[in-house]
Regions:
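Short hydrophobic alpha-helical segments that form membrane-spanning helices or hydrophobic packing faces
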Residues: 17-23, 51-52, 211-217, 222
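Acidic, metal-coordinating catalytic segment for phosphate/diphosphate chemistry
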Residues: 136-241
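DNA-contacting surface of Y-family translesion DNA polymerases
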Residues: 18-161
């Protein structure tokens, strides 16, 4: 596999492929011979994961054929095409990521009860924060709103931001029943669910960019990312250790 193009390796998406190319890494063999610490400094934890895969290392337990690992969470992150310097920038990217996470949850028949964000600044300092939410959800607007709330409560803009992630965790199935308080707008949530389903269908038939939120037109560079198509649902078995 040493001469195989690196993009064929699991988890090497468009952005990661571009970063590796900056270091002259073109094949899986190049990646296997790279310095793991250098990869970590530029890709975070994913640097070690890619280095391990390129070298054939995988200590996850062997499973029988047709065994499916349970999905424990659905998340997505992106290194932005330019540094984020204000709340508006972050809001756009969080909505893009929330769209991909919510769509994956709906596709797999799940809702999340925890929303988590990750943030990395332009000096590569990173942190994660999460929030237990009132009602399980796979509604795009709700996940985005919670993610933005978490960000506002935890970042003071000491430095510009280079990378952002959103994750839905503590998953339950779509048929999960929970008591709704008297002040919750059930009709409003049902309308949002129908709207999300309609958007999913339009994008399935005509492509991701066939329908966009008005927010995305405020910055065409940041909104150019198709997070859902570049999204990989990570197998729980490898990352649970």
């Amino acid at each position: 596999l040493g001469d195989v193009y690196k993009r064929q390796l699991l988890y090497v998406g468009k952005n990661t492929n571009r970063k590796l190319a900056l270091f002259g890494i073109k094949t899986i063999g190049d990646l296997a011979r790279a310095d793991e610490e250098v990869l970590n400094s530029h890709l975070g934890k994913m640097g070690s994961i890619l280095w391990s895969f390129a070298n054939g290392y995988d200590d996850s337990p062997v499973k029988l054929e047709n065994t499916h690992a349970p999905i424990k969470s659905v998340g997505n992150s992106t290194t932005t095409p330019k540094d984020l310097v204000c709340d508006e920038d972050v809001k756009i990217v969080l909505y893009i990521l929330a769209e991909s996470v919510a769509a994956r949850l709906r596709e797999n028949g799940f809702q999340c009860r925890v929303v988590e964000i990750s943030v990395r600044d332009n000096e590569l300092f990173s942190f994660t924060r999460q929030k237990k939410i009132d009602h399980a959800t796979n509604i795009t607007g709700e996940i985005a709103a919670y993610a933005y709330q978490i960000f506002k409560e935890n970042y003071n803009w000491s430095k510009p931001i280079r990378s952002v992630g959103v994750r839905g965790a503590d998953l339950v199935t779509d048929n999960y029943w929970e008591q709704i308080d008297l002040f919750s707008s059930v009709e409003k949530r049902e309308k949002q669910m129908k709207m999300d389903s309609a958007v999913d269908e339009i994008r399935r038939r005509f492509g991701f960019y066939s329908i966009q939120r008005g927010l995305m037109y405020r910055d065409r560079i940041l909104s150019a990312v198709n997070a859902k198509e570049e999204h990989t649902v990570h197998p729980h078995g490898y990352f649970s250790g």
